C-alpha cells in the first residue's frame, strides 16, 4: 500500500509516455474549422487522446477562472465549477453546455457526489458565496437546490474568521461529514450527518499524521477497510487515515503538489498543481503520467492565457474526475478557465 517514487521509476514511465502538443483553445473561443491533430498522452493501457475543444463555449462568452472541481452524476452529466457568478457548468459527455447551477456560489472549490435515499447529492466547499456567506460547506441537489450548510464550528477555537479556509469535503461510511481546512491550519473536521461538530484531527507539519495543506479528501475503497485519503499538497504526498482520525500511512510521496484524487476500480488519478496528472495502481505505484508539462515556468501559474499552454499538457492540474469508462476530466487552476477531457484509447 505504501510506495515512494524514485527517480528511476519516474524516468521509466516518463520515457514510455507519448505526447504530441499543439496550441490550446481558449475557453470561449469557437472551434477552429481545420481538424485538430490527434494528441495523446500516457502509456500502455493508460493511453489517452485529448478531445479537442471539449467544453468550448460560444464566442465572446467568459465564465471566469477554474479553481475548483469536476464531478459527474448518474446520467453522465459533467459538472465543472468556476470562479464567477455563472456558478457550476453542466455539460453532457460530449462537451455541450446544458445549463448552469448554483449561481449564488461563484467559487465552488470542491464537489463530492453521493446518493442518499434515492436522491443525487453534491457536497460542496464554497469559498465565496453571498457577501455574508464565505468559506462554508453547502450540500445541494444536482439542480443547485440547497439542503444544508456548515460553517466554522465554535469548538475549533478560531480567533479570527480568516482561520477557517476550507478546501474539501467527503462523507464517511456512516454519513459523517469530513471537511478539510486546507488553506487554514490543515486540520480535518468531522461532523455528524446533521452537521453537528464531533472532532478534529491532524495539524500543520511534515511528520506522520501531520499535513501542510490538506487540500483534497477522498474515500478510498480499494482495500478491505475503507480509508480517508488526504492530498497533503505541500508535503507532496497522499496519506491514509481511518474515519476516527487515526493516521494509517503515507502511501505515496514525491508527487507534484497533489490537489484531488478520483478512483476507477483499483486505480486512482491524482491532479498535481505542478503541471501533471498521475495514475496510481492499488499499491500506489505510478503506472502513467498524463499531460506532463516540461515547462516549469508554467507549473502552478494561474495567470497564463490558455492559448499559451500546449493542448496536451497541464499547467496547474487542480480538479480531476475519472468516469465509468476511465475517461478523465481535468480543470487547470487558471484565471481564464481551462478544461480538458482525456478519452481513454487503445494502442
Where does each model-flagged region fall?
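N-terminal secretory signal peptides and thylakoid transit peptides that target proteins
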Residues: 1-18
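Blade-level signature of beta-propeller repeat domains, shared across WD40, Kelch, NHL, RCC1
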Residues: 316-347
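Beta-rich, blade/repeat-based domains predominating
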Residues: 62-74, 105-118, 155-176, 206-227, ...
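Beta-strand-rich domains and repeat architectures in extracellular enzymes and scaffolds
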Residues: 52-83
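Blade-loop segments of beta-propeller domains
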Residues: 87, 93-119, 126-127
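Surface-exposed loop and turn segments in beta-propeller and other repeat-based domains
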Residues: 52-61, 147-160, 164, 198-209, ...
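Blade/loop signatures of beta-propeller domains
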Residues: 31-52
Amino acid at each position: 500500500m505504501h510506495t515512494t517514487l524514485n527517480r528511476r521509476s519516474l524516468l521509466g514511465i516518463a520515457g514510455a509516455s507519448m505526447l504530441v502538443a499543439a496550441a490550446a483553445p481558449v475557453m470561449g473561443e469557437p472551434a477552429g474549422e481545420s481538424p485538430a491533430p490527434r494528441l495523446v498522452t500516457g502509456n500502455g493501457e493508460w493511453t489517452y487522446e485529448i478531445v479537442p475543444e471539449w467544453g468550448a463555449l460560444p464566442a465572446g462568452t467568459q465564465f471566469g477562472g477554474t479553481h475548483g472541481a469536476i464531478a459527474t452524476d448518474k446520467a453522465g452529466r459533467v459538472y465543472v465549477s468556476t470562479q464567477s457568478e455563472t456558478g457550476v457548468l453542466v455539460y453532457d459527455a460530449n462537451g455541450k453546455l446544458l445549463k448552469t447551477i448554483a449561481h449564488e456560489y461563484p467559487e465552488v472549490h470542491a464537489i463530492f457526489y453521493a446518493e442518499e435515499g434515492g436522491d443525487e447529492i453534491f457536497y460542496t466547499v464554497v469559498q465565496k458565496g453571498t457577501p455574508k456567506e464565505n468559506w462554508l460547506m453547502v450540500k445541494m441537489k444536482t439542480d443547485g437546490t440547497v439542503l444544508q450548510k456548515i460553517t466554522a464550528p465554535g469548538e475549533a477555537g478560531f480567533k479570527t474568521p480568516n482561520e477557517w479556509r476550507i478546501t474539501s469535503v467527503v462523507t464517511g461510511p456512516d454519513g459523517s461529514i469530513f471537511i478539510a481546512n486546507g488553506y487554514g491550519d490543515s486540520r480535518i473536521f468531522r461532523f455528524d450527518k446533521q452537521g453537528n461538530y464531533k472532532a478534529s484531527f491532524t495539524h500543520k507539519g511534515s511528520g506522520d499524521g501531520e499535513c501542510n495543506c490538506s487540500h483534497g479528501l477522498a474515500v478510498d475503497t480499494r482495500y478491505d477497510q475503507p480509508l480517508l485519503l488526504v492530498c497533503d499538497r505541500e508535503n507532496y504526498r497522499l496519506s491514509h487515515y481511518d474515519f476516527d482520525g487515526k493516521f494509517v500511512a503515507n502511501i505515496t510521496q514525491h508527487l507534484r503538489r497533489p490537489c484531488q484524487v478520483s478512483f476507477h476500480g483499483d486505480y486512482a488519478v491524482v491532479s498535481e498543481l505542478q503541471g501533471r496528472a498521475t495514475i496510481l495502481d492499488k499499491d500506489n505505484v505510478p503506472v502513467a503520467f498524463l499531460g506532463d508539462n516540461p515547462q516549469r515556468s508554467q507549473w502552478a501559474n494561474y495567470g497564463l492565457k490558455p492559448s499559451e499552454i500546449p493542448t496536451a499538457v497541464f499547467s496547474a492540474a487542480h480538479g480531476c474526475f475519472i468516469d465509468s469508462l476511465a475517461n478523465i476530466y481535468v480543470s487547470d487552476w487558471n484565471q481564464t478557465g481551462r478544461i480538458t477531457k482525456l478519452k481513454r484509447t487503445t494502442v
